[in-house]
Amino acid sequence: MKRLLAKSTATPDRPEGEATLLGHTALVLSAARRLLEHRGRASLLAAGLDPALEPRLRRIVLLAAALHDLGKCSEHFQSMLRRQREAPQLVRHEALSLWLCWPGQPLSAWLQRDVSELDLCLALVCVAAHHRKFQTEAFAPDGTGAGLSLELRVQHEDFARTLGRIAEELALSAPPLFTAPIVLRATRKEHPRDQLQSWQDDFERTVPAGSVDARLLAVCKALVLAADVAGSALPRSGEKQDWVDRQLTAPHPAEALRAVVERRLAGHTPRPFQEEVARSAAPLTLVRAGCGSGKTAAAYLWAARQHPGRPLWLTYPTMGTATEGFRDYLHGADVEARLQHSRAEVDFDIFGLRDGAAPGTSSRDQDRLDALRSWGADAMSCTADTVLGLVQSQRQGLYAWPGLCAACVVFDEVHAYDDRLFGCLLRFLEALPGIPALLMTASLPATRLDVLRGMCERVHGRSLAEVEGPEDLETLPRYQRLDVAEPWALVAECLRDHGKVLWVSNTVDRCMRTAEAGTSHGARALLYHSRFRYEDRVRRHGDVIEAFATEGRAAFASTTQVAEMSLDLSADLLVTDLAPIPALIQRLGRLNRRSTLERPAPVRPFVVLPFDGPPYAAPDLRDARAWMERLGTGPLSQRDLVDAWGPPGMMDAPRRQSSTWLDGRFDTWPAPCRDGSPSLTVLLEEDARAVLDGAVSAHRVTLPMNLPPESFKWRAWPRAGRLPYPIPPANALDYDGLRGARWRKP
């Protein structure tokens, strides 16, 4: 073995410099220095930490960057890169890096001559964290053929040269020289897992949750991972290291954001409500205003006036709303803007957004490059998960840190957050008080509002800044509930008058049955729900938007909950299944949406159909029925919907959400940001062939489904190459590009 590799290469005996352990370590160290120069102080301020900690932050991050890949001297890792090993590695390389350097281990005496034991341990926990698989995947499962021992090639010349470079870069004393490999054994009597458990117990007693050291550790983890991303991605993309400097020193002129607002307002002056939002200098501001009030333009004004020089990150609950936000405000604007979510590449192609900004995609290497590019953007439109994923050690959230820590952030449509996502929002706001934040919502339960107010008092020592929507617009009558059991006559009448009908069902099956019933009533429906191939779903979204935007032509859309946020349209009649109060308020936001003070429209009718069962909990539906009774059958405004929600206590108070980034300390692993439901993403057989042939990206054609019947034995379905998506047999599923997918009955 001539060289110790850190990265795969086609020529392992004559590798490129950046593929070697020495070369990659030098690149990551260089990136870490640049990150600390430009984002060290900003990172501390974002986390509410004393800027006087900057020298210590620098010491920990640089040490972690230097040591992060020493475990790649493992014979298992080297054989894997050379494709000489099919069995898993007995111990992952980042765990081995920690093992080599922890106090009492082979390299610790050298390191502790110049570094305190606590800071060494903090750095090593960052080392172990940099792939977010510690300790969950640190060791190969039993019975996988990984073996019971491995050699660490510490005697190799490349290992010695790497230690020498580290000593030179960090001004450490001369490193030790090894003359023989170190053998690590993993037997029942002697297993490194037991050592790690003991070290974890000691470390977490020394670094309690919530302590300054624990908060500093979280920041260090993010910076070390970002340095590794830069050191890995830039050489492969042909970029030079000074590219990081250019991204992190890019100016963010407030004039660019003001120009976005001026273009959106089309010559009109901002409303008093928008001016009030823009004047908020508070670290945390809550804006409660109904649909169509101009909240988003107000958010741009707020960023331009209160936080000039900071990039603006706008977050939305869904990929669809993130794309819509980008299209409406940033596409074609004279601003360095990015759209970031896992299907952004597809949206750019379908919507023709390639001029003026760049998308993000989700392959691992591309994710890294996209994250680096986001560091220098003036404005980012992304999903809430991109930002709040940081709290749960998700890849995109950690990658975003160098851009995010110096930004101001807008969280739009927070009423749409489920309990887990709202809990992540609270942890984010609590842990990062130095990042100015603007929350926007059409409505908010009293229990959530109380928690926000209490958190703001506790963290910032001041009351939550609250801005209400414009009184005259909020109280404009828009809706009227009709208490009818059979809505089809209303649908037919509306369509005869060239009106627009939106029917929202709580399940895809009900949505499809509604469309089928519409056909029998002479009303052809456009379908829009979640069970489409992604590119088909985007096209169906466009069909619905176009149909509702065309004046003088009837339109009928049968949809599911996806309509609550992603459809920016105005209906003349809304028919909806009973749903939780926040969902019903969102659905009503699609009814008579364009009515304004200048051009008020007559109130429009809505019908709520009885519903019980999944996906909603019985108490939520019970509260919704009581809310409906309070609303009555007279004309209603957006303010009426919120006021009828009821007194505090109708909903349970949000529980404190655990955070793997903030609470994990010794361990680091990704966790979900949202409440999940059982689902299965599949590839149709013809799409799988196209993906394997390179004719199409998997992200364009993946199909999200509910779990199929167990009788289908779906766990045994084949996969397309290394992709995680099963391929159902043709007789298991019906798919139509206009109607979507459903499982066949077994």
UniProtKB/Swiss-Prot annotation:
The lineage of its organism: Bacteria, Pseudomonadati, Myxococcota, Myxococcia, Myxococcales. In the N-terminal section; belongs to the CRISPR-associated nuclease Cas3-HD family. Keywords: Antiviral defense, ATP-binding, Helicase, Hydrolase, Magnesium, Metal-binding, Nuclease, Nucleotide-binding. A motif (DEAH box) lies at residues 412-415. Induction: Part of an operon going from at least MXAN_7266 to MXAN_7259 that includes a CRISPR operon with transcription continuing into the pre-crRNA locus. GO terms for cellular component: cytosol. Gene3D superfamilies: 1.10.3210.30, P-loop containing nucleotide triphosphate hydrolases (3.40.50.300). Signal peptide: none annotated. This is Putative CRISPR-associated nuclease/helicase Cas3. Residues 14-230 form the HD Cas3-type domain. PROSITE patterns: HD_CAS3. Mg(2+) binds at D69, H131. The keyword Plastid does not apply. GO terms for biological process: defense response to virus.
